[in-house]
Amino acid sequence: MNTPENSYEQFLEPYLPSTTDRCFVTVTYAQSLDARIACAPGERTKLSGADTKRMTHFLRSKHDAILVGIDTVIADNPRLNCRYPTMAEDYNSPLSPQPVFLDTHFRWDFTKDWALLRSSTSKKPLIITESKNSGKIASYIEFGGEVLQVQDIRNWTEIARGLYSLGYTSVMVEGGAKVIDSCLTSGIADSVIITIAPVFLGTNGLAAAPSHAITFSEPRWWRSEGVPDTICAMKCDPISMK
């Protein structure tokens, strides 16, 4: 257990991206004491406090890309930028990672008013998709976006290799539940960083968990006086990508 004098920046150092010869994968999310990430599917639920939210933005500043599933995009309309260190609502750090959407059938309507497109400094998301809709793909590329077509959107080795081929050496996987479950189950994650809020969401809550048991190495816990949340950070042994 860390002392209050130790910052989360120091605590997280061993779990940050540490390789450039492949795409380093970090899975990070906030959950309740009963391992729920939301009160119900599709319902946005605030779990992180101000301090651990700032920690999330610190992590974003350390990654090339930030990845979420299309259901999370539609439900939450996130900005997916980095506001560290100021945390000002109108601040968009030059360290903001590249947004990446997992969108099997390319459902995202980029012509609508999305939060992450409102700033002139915002980065248009990279769409990872199985879709062969050449018209929509061409329109999005003309719009200024980028598309990575994959054979199987559940194949995280293919996703990581694709990201690396585009120059991304690290990706932060933030959600939602299906994406977290799939990524953890694949065994490709290098680090897992979980914020645990002091609340139960109940059996109707949306859980995030892999489909089988996973043992992590070097687990560490961080707490600080006056901060209600706890952070658990762990290392994984990623599958071979060679």
Predicted features, each with a name:
Residues 1-242:
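Enzymes that bind and transform nitrogen-containing heteroaromatic metabolites
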